Amino acid sequence: MTSEPSLAPDFQVSAWLNAPEPPSLAALRGRVVVALAFQMLCPGCVQYALPQLLRVRRAFHAYRVATLALHTVFEHHAANSRATLEAFAHEYRLDAPIGIDAPDPVGGPIPRTMAAYAMQGTP
């Protein structure tokens, strides 16, 4: 027995970088969306996942394939500030929209989108 497909929940972010307007999955409906959850202190994210996202971004026309990045902070919270992420994005030439995952409303370590998607880590 298969269940009915469901729509992916929108990202719950505190801010977006590289986006003149906050992107939403509802607005991108009908297009392929490649989304990457990463943390800038994750070696696998920096070495493999982010370069792959940039390759996808450059290989496909933006009207057909949307690329989004989600910065999920589930550890080392003090080192993962917005200012540090902005410098990181500039240094690594990340031009895709980057959402900063909203923190847990009750102060837990797992941010909201990461929890909504039941992610266990990055990349």
Residue ranges of each PLM-predicted region?
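Thiol/disulfide oxidoreductase modules built on the thioredoxin-like
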Residues: Y92-L94, I100-P123
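Structural microenvironment flanking redox-active thiols in thiol-disulfide oxidoreductases
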Residues: V46-Y92, P103-I110
